[in-house]
Every structure is written in structure tokens, then in C-alpha cells.
Design a protein with these regions (language model features):
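A short, Trp-centered hydrophobic/proline-enriched beta-strand micro-motif
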Residues: 117-127
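Internal helix-loop-helix
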Residues: 48-108, 112, 116-117, 154-161, ...
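Glycine-rich beta->alpha junctions and the first turn(s) of the following alpha-helix
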Residues: 2-8, 12, 80, 189-285
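Residue-level signal for inorganic ion chemistry
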Residues: 9, 20, 74, 103, ...
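C-terminal helix-coil-helix/basic helical segment that borders enzyme active sites and/or dimer interfaces
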Residues: 27-35, 253, 257-264, 280-306
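A structural signal for short hydrophobic beta-strand segments in well-ordered beta-sheet cores
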Residues: 139-142
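Short secondary-structure junction/hinge motifs that connect adjacent elements
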Residues: 27-49
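A short core secondary-structure module
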Residues: 124, 149-190
């Protein structure tokens, strides 16, 4: 079984890498991290112009009509550049949830806005510490009205809309959870940015006060849909991490070749060689696993949750 990417995918990778090298150098990333802006707006517009935000969105809804393999390619380059934009929350989570469960009206309203960079989306799942589970979701939905708090919500302080997991039953089963789509700008939602260990990923607390919401998908199937979205997002985040690991390895190699000690590059010392070799093996293993995940994601294989 061949998990390698095609020549077309590699061409897409080269285009994405060139674009991000020009528009998202380390200096630009540092400007966002050290400044007051929560993301790079110019880069976000540029990604939309390149078609990267809508690469997995069908052409019917304003996207490129490609697929998840192409999105994996873009994800790796986003991680390599440490791009300070709400890409994962909007593309991996919100857009995928709408594609999976949204009505035709919801798809026609939000997907073109995502592809054009006019809308930022997120998934409001967590309600404090701990792993996500149906039991951990307590925010109630009554008559499509939400009241409660979600935190942390990735990029919640800058999001235009959110996919919200809420409780619609009390049986103690997974079927107690349903998904809702909330237009944050329409009112009924207070967003407060949270202090985060990783400044490249904004987190927020969203407070819903008699907030009107639209059901996203059938009532009682929210947890099943969330699980599918998270499984796919895990693969895409893995590609971002592989991209970052590869770039770190390249930087370490270059430093080892340039740094002189005792009259020769430190890369010539056996201890440094061993360190770089171990890094390479770890990065290659991660890449292999990610490629397997990309295959599972693109074919909807049963192995995906694993």
C-alpha cells in the first residue's frame, strides 16, 4: 500500500510553502505573538485568495472542491510556518461540522463565507478541565435556546459563529447531546479572551444568555457527529505537528553545520549526530503515522478513530 502523495499534491505543497515563506516569516509570527492582534488578518485574506481556506469545501459552496488529502498537505505547511491564524478552528472543526451535518441553507450561508475568509468559526465543546465526553457536557438547550458557559473555546474571542454541543436529554446516554449553530454576532453571546500558555492559539470563554441557536443535524446525534469531526481534526493537527517538527529538525541541522567549536562544526561531533538522528527517526515515524491517518480520512476507513 502506497501512502505517498501524488505529484499534484507535492506541487500544491510547494505552492503553499512558497506562499507561507513569503507571507508568514518568523518575524511576522513574532509580531502577532508580541502584539495586541489575535491573528494575522492579511495572512488570513491571503490564504483565502489562494483557495486554501476552502480546499475541502465543494465548489457548489464556493470552495476549491478538492478533498482531505489536499487539506492534509496544506495543514503540514501551516504547522511548518506556525501560521498565526484561526485555521484549525475554522477549517478542521467548524467547516467540517457543517459539511457533515448542516442543512442546505446552513451550508449555503456559512461555507462560502469560510472559503472567502469572511467568517471565522469554532467548536464550543469543553466546559472546563478534562477530556471531552457526553457526561462532561452540561450546557442545556431548551427550545433552541442556550444558557451556560463553554471554555476553553479555540479562537472563540474572534469567531463569527460557533458549533455548540449542548444537552437535550437526561437519559445518561450519548443521545443526550445535540449540536447547534450559533451566530455569535447576532447577540446573546459574551466572549472573553483567556490567558493561554500558547499565545499562537487564542482561547476564550463563551457565555450564552438566552441565545437563539439553530439545530445542526438531527437531535440526539450530536456526540456521534462531534466524534467524527474530532477524529478528522486529529489527523489534520498531526500534519501540522509533523510540519513543525520537520522545520525544527532543519533548523537544528543548519545550526549544527554553522556553529563552530574547537575548530570544526558541532555537527561533526558524534553526540550531536546521535541527537539529530534520533530527531529524524521520531519525525519520520510521526510522518508515517500521519500519512496512514490521511489515507483513513480521505477514504472514510474504519481505522480512522484509531
Amino acid at each position: 500500500m502506497n501512502f505517498d502523495f501524488s505529484d499534484e499534491h507535492k506541487q500544491l505543497r510547494d505552492e503553499a510553502r512558497k506562499f507561507l515563506a513569503e507571507k508568514c516569516p518568523p518575524k511576522a509570527v513574532r509580531t502577532v505573538l508580541d502584539g495586541k492582534s489575535s491573528y494575522d488578518r492579511d495572512l488570513w485574506k491571503g490564504l483565502a485568495g489562494m483557495g486554501f481556506l476552502g480546499v475541502a469545501i465543494p465548489e457548489t459552496y464556493g470552495g476549491a472542491g478538492a478533498g482531505h488529502l489536499e487539506l492534509c498537505v496544506i495543514a503540514e505547511e501551516m504547522g511548518r510556518a506556525l501560521a498565526p491564524v484561526p485555521f484549525s478552528s475554522t477549517v478542521y472543526l467548524a467547516a467540517e461540522a457543517i459539511l457533515l451535518a448542516g442543512s442546505e441553507a446552513q451550508k449555503r450561508k456559512w461555507l462560502p463565507l469560510i472559503a472567502s475568509g469572511e467568517a471565522i468559526g469554532t467548536l464550543a465543546l469543553f466546559e472546563g478541565k478534562g477530556n471531552p465526553s457526553p457526561q462532561a457536557i452540561r450546557l442545556p438547550a431548551s427550545g433552541n435556546i442556550l444558557n451556560g458557559v463553554k471554555k476553553p473555546v479555540p479562537d472563540g474571542a474572534i469567531a463569527d459563529f460557533a458549533i455548540v454541543a449542548a444537552r437535550t436529554g437526561s437519559t445518561g446516554r450519548d443521545s443526550d447531546i445535540s449540536l447547534f449553530l450559533v451566530d455569535i454576532k447576532a447577540g446573546g453571546v459574551d466572549a472573553k479572551a483567556l490567558t493561554n500558555v500558547d499565545p499562537s492559539r487564542g482561547q476564550a470563554e463563551l457565555t450564552f444568555k438566552n441565545c437563539k441557536a439553530e439545530p445542526l443535524g438531527p437531535v440526539g446525534e450530536g456526540w456521534s457527529m462531534v466524534s467524527q469531526v474530532l477524529d478528522g481534526a486529529a489527523v489534520l493537527i498531526a500534519f501540522e505537528q509533523v510540519g513543525g517538527a520537520d522545520r525544527a529538525l532543519e533548523m537544528g541541522r543548519d545550526y549544527a553545520l554553522d556553529r563552530i567549536a574547537f575548530g570544526r562544526p558541532i555537527g561533526s561531533f558524534q553526540a550531536v549526530k546521535h541527537m539529530l538522528a534520533d530527531m529524524y527517526v521520531s519525525a519520520t515515524l510521526a510522518r508515517s503515522n500521519s500519512y496512514y491517518g490521511a489515507w483513513a480520512l480521505s477514504t472514510s476507513a474504519s481505522e480512522l478513530p484509531e
